[in-house]
């Protein structure tokens, strides 16, 4: 079976990891080889970069340094994990990818969109999502969920609400620009309803007839 690359995008607390687990179960039940991964992270060096980016270790970073660390982590993630997995026929399900960079470092931080896209293309080369599932959620709801979850990875959650609103708008704008690839899904629903919507999209998109 041909490898597929499916990315999950959205703001904080949108439920990406939960829905990746749900889709993984559905695919594996039908004999699909699945690899789940995340960004930043996914391989040892990229996970070390993640620690800097999403915890208090990164508080002193400016926007340029933050971006360069993200791109370095992505380069190694693609090289070490994503490209080999796709070549071996796995379906790769990734929690965040290039769209998050455009939304957070572009929409949220105010970075130059065309320049970010150029850098992104240079880093990823021929690796590009077959499908992107955008879990859309009001930032006030998502941030409340994330706060209840707790943990040390709270650096971005501490940004102002206006930052997260800009991130959301950037995601939605990208979905309008690329409607064939990037599918917005209402994440303010019960987990199983969101999972069912995602499965219908995946099944229909790839003509899955198991």
UniProtKB/Swiss-Prot annotation:
One of its GO terms (cellular component) is cytosol. ATP binds at residues 10-17. GO terms for molecular function: ATP binding; dTMP kinase activity. The keyword ATP-binding applies. Gene3D superfamilies: P-loop containing nucleotide triphosphate hydrolases. One of its GO terms (biological process) is dTDP biosynthetic process. It comes from the Bacteria. The keyword Thylakoid does not apply. Signal peptide: none annotated. Its EC number is 2.7.4.9. It catalyses: dTMP + ATP = dTDP + ADP. Pfam families: Thymidylate_kin. Transmembrane segments: none annotated. SUPFAM superfamilies: P-loop containing nucleoside triphosphate hydrolases (SSF52540). Keywords: ATP-binding, Kinase, Nucleotide biosynthesis, Nucleotide-binding, Transferase. InterPro entries: P-loop_NTPase, Thymidylate_kin-like_dom, Thymidylate_kin_CS, Thymidylate_kinase. Belongs to the thymidylate kinase family. Phosphorylation of dTMP to form dTDP in both de novo and salvage pathways of dTTP synthesis. This is Thymidylate kinase. The lineage of its organism: Bacteria, Pseudomonadati, Pseudomonadota, Alphaproteobacteria, Magnetococcales.
